[in-house]
Amino acid sequence: MPKKEIVQLKLEAPNPNLSPATKFGNLVFVAGQTGRHPVTGEVGKDIREQTRNVLEHIKLILAAAGTSMDNVLTVITHLTKREDLAAYNEEYAKYFPANKPARTTVTAMLNAPELLVEITVTACIPD
């Protein structure tokens, strides 16, 4: 049985409460990422900017794990406002133009009022 491996990024200080992602075999489980910029930590001004921030951060995490957005299998999205869904979908489509992963989108309250979106993904590392 493969051993669980923690994926860390060099650009951010490790969070003592969670890992950006874990690898198990050829699967990568990315923790929920929010609308903060992956380098500066600043929160995006609207749903479009926050969605881009999240997906760019996920892209970096997947690269550190040895895979890419092309290999995302599932996406779970939490939006704080249902009315943001159309704008979210437009930004999301830029990152997944074809071979879209299975996706669940729900409306939920997040841990900070300025955050509008949180995304969790599972990806694979191709053989």
Predicted regions and their residues:
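N-terminal presequence-like segments and the immediate start of the first folded domain
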Residues: 1-56, 60-73, 79-127
